[in-house]
């Protein structure tokens, strides 16, 4: 567990109305998504999602007016430190801007979660660089989960050497704050499958949740989505349904992931899934390219595809308020 105090793409393919592997057509996918920028404010209450597009200074989540005792945290994702390519020639610069944006929110987050692909090539130097950069975040705690780019060639050992203190197994863990139970999962170690949890981790989740009352709000972090967003590209977790079954009894469950480099929301009963954008480079919309490769957009539009996420919760309210903001 990392918790330290240092403080546009080609035309859609012509099967847009055919169901995909997970039962959603590509047109249905688009209805769930907020592609390439635009701050999307989402309120999760009673298993329903209400959303609208908002500017960075939208009044629904004013930074300085949090209710007393509220939990406020930030999700950042997919910084890909070490990436070199035309999709973003300065990922260090854009990640630095994201850190400055977090520090300029007008409040001190209770914690910051980086939901994976901290690095691009899993080198010791890249892990050290991103760790040093995140010490500049004005927060008491920073948590992480690994992405597949953090697990290249060594099943995540170098990642765990830098960010794995206090974790269990291959890097999973849980914690509680402000009446919310958080679970951080690792689903990036089987690169031939991409999204995979494994029996040991699923058993951990079973034991971890067993003693919790069903009215406990639960937030689950992972890198790859825990729902079948687009299995053809590895945007799914093959054994996630076993964890989802354990979460069904809770009245409010929110799953936050990275990996897909774009905003996406899906609700299934009491569980809402939110995919985050990136601080590095955009990926194509599902079905609009042969593969999920970095997309080159005009330089002036790049920041519209990058961003951060803030989440607010007040104890006693069965809701989370989620706001996605493009880089300023």
Where are the language model's segments positioned?
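N-terminal active-site segment of His-dependent metallophosphoesterases
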Residues: 17-18, 48, 52-128, 207
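Short, well-ordered beta-to-alpha junction loops that form the rim of enzyme active sites
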Residues: 187, 221-226, 258-260, 325
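N-terminal secretory signal peptides
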Residues: 1-28
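N-terminal export leaders
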Residues: 24-50
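Short acidic, glycine-rich surface-loop motifs adjacent to enzyme active sites
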Residues: 213-229
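Surface-exposed cleft-lining segments at the edges of enzyme active sites
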Residues: 83-85, 118-119, 188-197, 227-232
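Active-site neighborhood of phospho(di)ester-bond hydrolases with catalytic His/Asp-centered motifs
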Residues: 76-77, 112-116, 143-148, 221-222, ...
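Extended active-site neighborhood of metal-dependent phosphoesterases/phosphodiesterases
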Residues: 59, 65, 123-217, 239-254, ...
């Amino acid at each position: 567990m990392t918790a330290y105090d240092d403080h546009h793409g080609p035309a859609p393919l012509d099967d847009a109305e055919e169901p995909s592997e997970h039962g959603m057509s590509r047109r249905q996918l688009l209805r769930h998504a907020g592609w390439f920028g635009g701050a999307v404010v989402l309120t999760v209450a009673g298993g329903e999602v209400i959303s609208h597009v908002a500017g960075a200074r939208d009044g629904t989540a004013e930074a300085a007016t949090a209710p007393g005792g509220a939990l406020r945290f930030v999700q950042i994702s997919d910084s890909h430190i070490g990436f070199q390519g035309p999709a973003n020639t300065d990922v260090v610069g854009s990640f630095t801007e994201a850190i400055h944006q977090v520090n300029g929110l007008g409040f001190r987050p209770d914690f910051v979660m980086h939901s994976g692909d901290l690095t691009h090539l899993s080198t010791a130097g890249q892990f050290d660089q991103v760790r040093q950069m995140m010490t500049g975040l004005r927060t008491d705690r920073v948590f992480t989960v690994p992405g597949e780019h953090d697990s290249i060639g060594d099943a995540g050992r170098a990642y765990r050497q830098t960010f794995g203190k206090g974790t269990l197994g291959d890097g999973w863990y849980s914690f509680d704050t402000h009446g919310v139970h958080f679970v951080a999962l690792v689903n990036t170690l089987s690169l031939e499958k991409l999204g995979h949890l494994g029996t040991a981790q699923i058993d951990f989740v079973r034991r971890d949740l067993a003693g919790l009352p069903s009215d406990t709000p639960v937030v689950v972090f992972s890198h790859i989505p825990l729902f079948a967003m687009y299995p053809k590209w590895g945007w799914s977790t093959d054994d996630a349904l076993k964890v989802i079954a354990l979460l069904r009894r809770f009245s409010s469950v929110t799953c936050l992931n990275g990996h897909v480099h774009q905003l996406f929301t899906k609700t299934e009963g009491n569980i809402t899934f939110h995919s985050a954008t990136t601080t590095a480079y955009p990926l194509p919309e599902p079905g609009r390219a042969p593969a999920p490769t970095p997309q080159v957009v005009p330089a002036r539009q790049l920041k519209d595809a990058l961003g951060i996420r803030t989440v607010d919760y007040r104890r006693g309210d069965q809701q989370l308020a989620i706001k996605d903001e493009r880089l300023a």
